[in-house]
């Protein structure tokens, strides 16, 4: 044997050992991730005592940060993983799915700071709830419009399995009403701005729009199979047309129609593409699949942005054809702006998805948009179409192998920074040794690992795409939704009382660390209990106008009494206004809006010495 051939044999042996080690890690960690995700689901989850049945808790962490809530988005994505695992053969998971849709039927009816179910449906845009399913009154980025779409997708996937197994009546009578509410919300509000999946940017989000499109397409398919009408689903082409406008010529800008100034390079887009992945979709499908040329170009630009060792020291010295630790966006400062497990793992899933689609189609198309992505991994690549061939040494198979190895390298990054016990927090430190930080045992992190491992093993969710023709011109359509409590699924029979949005504005000069709350005589204002009152926002506070504000949905036509309350720092307690205020909420069915223009009346406090 020559020295050269001997070296090649040695390198091949090392590569096989590394691959086997990664295989063992994925197998072991996948089992840990699934169990850990289930441990965060009520009522029996070992990490979330007190959570209601079917409630998916974001994390057991109750401080620094407090994630002991249920987010509609996180819950839907987690349960989509659970539904997929169930369909793939784990029948023990059905009880979690049944509990989930019962809990969501109830949550849909909970009046909250975003609104109520009746008659406008605005309450469906609320981001999070307490773990018993009750409303969260704190200041937050509201509304968030991805939740209803993602929940609909999850329940539609389960519904198709039920229909295939002879339970169409259950779907039509019990589950469809939940889905119909969410689809109505999507159809009515898809073209309205809201907060993105990171809960920071108010505008139009790529991730949200992509999920909304999928929900309407799948909703239409399910409605047809049930013989029911989905009026909102008719808007799918308009949503799809709008999705194309996020492309800026180089990459997808994650958020548009926003005042927030960022580059727009954001993991939002990668996560969006894997959430709409369909192995049967073509790579030029306008739903923007992982194998789409623009998706691949966007992937390279985002990943390259995080190769900066000054930004992420853990990525120092990693070559261009290897995976790196990824965060949300390069301007991130939350908890120091670190890599996220679910995003780094999501990058691997994205690549496994693309490889699966190329294999399904038997070809790989390389154009001027995607060529830089391929060139990093396979330098001899040229523009054109690479066809599947019997010769294993051809370019088609070589590209598949290199992209698969690239995907594995992102998994290897996660392997390096996941503790030996398999626990997965939200983030890991951008500086060596890359220790876990932020919320512990993040449910979404675990769900992301399971879905990645499914794709790596060649296990794929059911197909959903249909042929949708892009309109010649994008239009800003909307259809007013019809909302009905899903009583057969366990929802309370809430009736016709409507709610009307009221903007509370008060000028109150405060010191750093002091907050202002709104309390009043109705449940939406805490029924005079400041602990359940509305925390106000100082986002528009200036020295010239010390404005605190909050938007609240109140019962239409009622007289409401309210006051403002200062919450002092250093456990100094509360200071109440010395005046009682009243207002009359506009009647139901009117287009009249109401905003107060108040000024604080009463004593003020001073900062404590803590």
Annotate each PLM feature.
Residues 1-20:
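Fungal secretory targeting signals
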Residues 67-188, 209, 216:
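Aromatic-rich carbohydrate-recognition surfaces in CAZymes
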């Amino acid at each position: 044997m020559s020295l050269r051939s001997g070296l090649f044999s040695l390198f091949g042996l090392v590569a096989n050992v590394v691959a086997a080690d990664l295989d063992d890690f994925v197998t072991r960690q996948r089992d840990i991730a699934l169990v850990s995700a289930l441990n965060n689901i009520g009522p029996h989850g070992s990490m979330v005592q007190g959570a209601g049945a079917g409630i998916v808790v974001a994390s057991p962490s109750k401080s620094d940060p407090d994630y002991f809530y249920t987010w509609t988005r996180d819950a839907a994505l987690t349960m989509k993983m659970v539904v997929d695992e169930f369909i793939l053969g784990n029948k023990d998971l059905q009880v979690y799915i049944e509990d989930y849709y019962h809990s969501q039927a109830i949550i849909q009816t909970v009046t909250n700071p975003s609104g109520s179910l009746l008659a406008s449906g605005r309450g469906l845009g609320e981001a999070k709830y307490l773990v018993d399913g009750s409303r969260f009154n704190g200041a937050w980025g509201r509304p968030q419009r991805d939740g209803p779409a993602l929940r609909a997708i999850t329940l539609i996937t389960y519904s198709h399995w039920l229909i295939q197994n002879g339970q169409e009546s259950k779907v039509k009578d019990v589950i469809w009403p939940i889905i119909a509410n969410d689809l109505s919300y999507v159809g009515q509000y898809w073209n309205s701005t809201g907060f993105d999946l990171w809960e920071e940017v108010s505008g139009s989000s790529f991730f949200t729009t992509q999920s909304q499109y999928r929900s309407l397409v799948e909703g239409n398919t399910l409605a047809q199979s049930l013989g029911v009408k989905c009026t909102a689903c008719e808007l799918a082409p308009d949503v799809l047309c709008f999705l194309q406008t996020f492309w800026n010529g180089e990459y997808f800008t994650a958020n548009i129609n926003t005042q927030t100034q960022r580059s727009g390079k954001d993991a939002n887009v990668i996560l969006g593409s894997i959430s709409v992945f369909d192995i049967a979709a073509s790579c030029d499908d306008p739903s923007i699949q992982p194998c789409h040329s623009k998706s691949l170009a966007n992937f390279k630009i985002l990943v390259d942005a995080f190769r900066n060792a000054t930004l992420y020291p853990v990525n120092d010295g990693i070559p261009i054809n290897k995976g790196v630790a990824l965060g949300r966006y390069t301007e991130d400062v939350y908890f120091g702006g670190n890599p996220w497990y679910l995003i780094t793992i999501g990058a691997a899933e994205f690549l496994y998805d693309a490889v699966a689609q190329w294999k399904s189609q038997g070809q790989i198309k390389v154009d001027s948009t995607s060529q830089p992505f391929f060139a990093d991994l396979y330098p001899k690549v040229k523009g054109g179409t690479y066809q599947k061939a019997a010769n294993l040494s051809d370019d088609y198979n070589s590209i598949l192998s290199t992209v698969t190895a690239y995907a594995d390298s992102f998994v290897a990054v996660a392997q390096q920074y996941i503790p030996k016990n398999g626990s997965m927090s939200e983030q890991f430190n951008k500086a060596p040794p890359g220790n876990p930080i932020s919320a512990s045992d993040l449910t979404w992190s675990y769900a992301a690992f399971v879905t990645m491992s499914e794709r790596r093993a060649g296990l794929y969710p059911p197909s959903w795409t249909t042929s949708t023709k892009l309109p010649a011109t994008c239009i800003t359509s909307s259809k007013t939704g019809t909302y009905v409590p899903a009583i057969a699924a366990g929802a309370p029979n809430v009736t016709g009382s409507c709610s009307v949005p009221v903007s509370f504005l008060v000028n109150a000069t405060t010191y750093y660390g002091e907050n202002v709350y709104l309390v009043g005589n109705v449940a939406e204002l805490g029924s005079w209990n400041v602990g359940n009152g509305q925390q106000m926002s100082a986002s528009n506070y200036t020295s010239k106008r010390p404005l605190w504000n909050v938007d609240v949905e109140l019962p239409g036509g009622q007289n409401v009494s309210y006051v403002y309350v200062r919450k002092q720092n250093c456990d100094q307690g509360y200071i109440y206004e010395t005046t009682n205020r009243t207002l009359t909420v506009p009647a139901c069915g009117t287009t009249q809006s109401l905003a107060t223009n108040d000024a604080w009346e009463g004593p003020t406090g001073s900062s404590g010495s803590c």
